[in-house]
Amino acid sequence: MNPSTIGGINKLPEAEKRAIYARYIPRELIEKFNLPELTSHKELLQFRFAEGSSDVEMRVYHQVGFTDPVLYAHLTDTMNGQIHVLLYILNDPEAPRFDVDRMPDGSPTRFGTLKRNLEAEQAAMRSGLAPGQVRRGLRLLQPATAAFEQFITSLGHDMYFVEPLYYHNAVIFERYGFAYQMGKRRMEAIHAGFQEGGELRGRLDDSNPFRSPEAANSIRLRSWAIHDGILDEPFTDVTMYKRVGTSANVSTTPGCEW
């Protein structure tokens, strides 16, 4: 019987685990970088999937020894055996790098949740990036979603969950057909707060580069303001899900541009 959970897959021999997890690498990514057969290439396709654990981290590199993977994914099981995406990142290795993930001394920032490299964050924001991005993305989220849904289906599931780390992530997931398990009212309240007369709009006082008034009408700049602490609390308690092959048609930010 084929395993249906991350914990089940992690009990398999390593070659089988690699083959199963490699299914959610989008073909378009492999073709873009002309990657070789990856399941046996341990330097380009790296995993952390200890036997007995219920999570897996995958890194796909376009060349051996490069600083950042072109694809990073961290998956885990929910309490009832569903697949939960904790983090999914696509990096363009040819784009400039911004060290928002580490301090000048090399210590990690955990994407700005532990500490912040403000100089790198400001440079990233000016270059059009959103919070958490060290490089521009690859614009492959649509085929990546399709490949991931094929992987989910192969495990016998018809839905999966995601944890948006930032405000803009949640909005992007909305646009790709996700619905909210929890946090929709929070997202709607944030949108309302940025409207004319709203409390959050009033806090966009130009006191620092992350709080410019123009952020009120931009998903990306709102996300930077939220990352900067404009909510007076972390952006948490938002969980989303998607049913394979369907779109929930949810929007908590009507009329707001990227």
Q: What residue ranges belong to the model's regions?
A:
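Intrinsically disordered, low-complexity, charge-dense segments enriched in Lys/Arg
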Residues: N2, G7, K11, E188-W258
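Acyl-donor binding region in acyl/amide transferases
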Residues: G81-G177, Q181, R186, I190-F194
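Long, acidic/serine-threonine-rich intrinsically disordered regions with weak helical/coil propensity
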Residues: M1-G106
